[in-house]
Amino acid sequence: MPAYPREGKIIQIHSYKHNGTIHRIWQETVVLKGTSAYVIGGNDKTLVMEADGRTWVTREPAICFFHAKHWFNIIAMIREDGVYYYCNLSSPFVWDDEALKYIDYDLDIKVFPDMTYMLLDEDEYERHRREMNYPDVIDRILKNNVQKLIGWIQERKGPFAPEFIDKWYGVFQAYQK
């Protein structure tokens, strides 16, 4: 069994908190590229279930990027006025045939079409760090990965490169036909 989902497979994405509780589930994402290092997925109008049972449906197509070594994942939301990115500071992903899974560590970076960005949820991170006793090593890793992610944004690296989204959104659209 490979440690990653195969291309074309429709998978769920499960986000957990550090204490092991479920945080959020995305019902359907099509795998556009799956390797042991990273998974690229696409979804549109997918059902999302929150930990408290509330559900909602995503509003626009999105290309998702998960890495097996970096402590973040990146969701590019394709809107009429441009591509918006939502970056979650998280554990690297794991794949177990049930779903692609990761631990959400509260800190987020929102990136706008002009590539300006905002670090979000620092208060929530500090509160959960205390409540769930995040180890100091995790705190250091996450803070280092915030800087790495900002570097990627500034350098237009990986998912932040315009050709990345153009390519993978095209692949996703081909699966939608």
Curated annotation (Swiss-Prot):
One Pfam family matching this protein: DUF402
EC number: 3.6.1.15, 3.6.1.6
UniProt GO molecular function: magnesium ion binding; nucleoside diphosphate phosphatase activity; ribonucleoside triphosphate phosphatase activity
Keywords: Hydrolase, Magnesium, Metal-binding
Coiled-coil residues: none
Record-listed Mg(2+) 1 binding positions: N88, D104, D108
Co-factor requirement: Mg(2+)
Classification via InterPro entries: DUF402, FomD-like_sf, Ntdp-like, SA1684
Swiss-Prot/TrEMBL catalytic activity: a ribonucleoside 5'-triphosphate + H2O = a ribonucleoside 5'-diphosphate + phosphate + H(+); a ribonucleoside 5'-diphosphate + H2O = a ribonucleoside 5'-phosphate + phosphate + H(+)
Domain of life, per lineage: Bacteria
Catalytic residue list: R24
Binding-site positions, Mg(2+) 2: D106, D108, D121, E124
Keyword Hydrolase: yes
SUPFAM superfamilies in the cross-refs: FomD-like
Class of the enzyme per the UniProt entry, highest EC level: hydrolase
Residues spanning the membrane: none
Family the UniProt entry places it in: Belongs to the Ntdp family.
Protein role: Has nucleoside phosphatase activity towards nucleoside triphosphates and nucleoside diphosphates.
Protein name: Nucleoside triphosphate/diphosphate phosphatase
Source species of the chain: Geobacillus thermodenitrificans (strain NG80-2)
